[in-house]
């Protein structure tokens, strides 16, 4: 279901959080389109945390710590990276108003980024919204091979450690299917969302101010209950 919102300036961060709690989220047609529309997919993409999959090759990359991974240190740069054209994706739905809204959510503590670095260069990352025990993945990007995948592995380890129960990917791509992403009907999604909104999770269960070794992230995922 999609509903056109022509007065996107009227969407506030607080309204945005209420929308997520109802299972809907905003998008734009393109980076140049100033309007937003609400989306509630009939089939919702989720990655069940209990069945998150990592390939052997990616596990070796994570274990090697060849990338430095940080959290919430370069949120604006991550959303800009997600908005930039990439191979196979010439356009983006992240317009100026989307950028403003999610930066505001970040400043309120409800939106987080995972950054992946090679030296001083940001080469990948992701960002998403936290609400209750749910995390809503918004977008990811990479300019170095596996950088966004490494960000996702570290995110999942943090969610498991913090007691999250729902990782919402909104839609499912072939890329996400490799990690175990599935599509579920709207009614089932809403039941999972309602359960996730009850209780609290701790995004800071793993340190926010220092890197988490890749071996630790992999162990958390391997040892999940």
UniProtKB/Swiss-Prot annotation:
Transmembrane segments: none annotated. It holds the Pfam family Leu_Phe_trans. Keywords: Acyltransferase, Cytoplasm, Transferase. It catalyses: N-terminal L-lysyl-[protein] + L-leucyl-tRNA(Leu) = N-terminal L-leucyl-L-lysyl-[protein] + tRNA(Leu) + H(+); N-terminal L-arginyl-[protein] + L-leucyl-tRNA(Leu) = N-terminal L-leucyl-L-arginyl-[protein] + tRNA(Leu) + H(+); L-phenylalanyl-tRNA(Phe) + an N-terminal L-alpha-aminoacyl-[protein] = an N-terminal L-phenylalanyl-L-alpha-aminoacyl-[protein] + tRNA(Phe). The gene is aat. Signal peptide: none annotated. GO terms for molecular function: leucyl-tRNA--protein transferase activity. It comes from Nitrobacter hamburgensis (strain DSM 10229 / NCIMB 13809 / X14). InterPro entries: Acyl_CoA_acyltransferase, Leu/Phe-tRNA_Trfase, Leu/Phe-tRNA_Trfase_C, Leu/Phe-tRNA_Trfase_N. Belongs to the L/F-transferase family. Its main location: cytoplasm. This is Leucyl/phenylalanyl-tRNA--protein transferase. One of its GO terms (biological process) is protein catabolic process. The keyword Transferase applies.
């Amino acid at each position: 279901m999609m509903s056109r919102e022509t007065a996107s300036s009227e969407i506030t961060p607080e309204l945005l959080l209420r929308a997520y709690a109802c299972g809907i989220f905003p998008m734009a047609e393109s980076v140049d389109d100033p309007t937003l529309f609400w989306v509630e997919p009939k089939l919702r993409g989720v990655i069940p945390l209990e069945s998150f999959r990592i390939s052997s090759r990616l596990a070796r990359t994570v274990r090697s710590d060849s990338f430095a991974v940080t959290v919430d240190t370069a949120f604006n740069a991550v959303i800009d990276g997600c908005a930039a054209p990439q191979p196979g994706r010439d356009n983006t739905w992240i317009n100026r108003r989307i950028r403003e809204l999610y930066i505001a959510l970040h400043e309120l503590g409800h939106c987080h980024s995972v950054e992946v670095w090679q030296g001083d260069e940001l080469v990948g990352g992701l960002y998403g919204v936290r609400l209750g025990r749910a995390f809503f993945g918004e977008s990811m990007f990479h300019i170095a091979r596996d950088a966004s995948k490494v960000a996702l592995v570290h995110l999942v380890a943090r969610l498991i450690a913090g007691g999250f129960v729902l990782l919402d990917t909104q839609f499912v791509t072939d890329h996400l299917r490799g990690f175990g992403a599935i599509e579920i009907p709207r009614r089932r999604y809403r039941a999972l969302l309602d359960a996730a909104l009850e209780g609290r999770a701790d995004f800071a269960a793993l340190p926010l101010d220092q890197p988490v070794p890749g071996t630790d992230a992999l162990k958390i995922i391997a040892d999940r209950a």
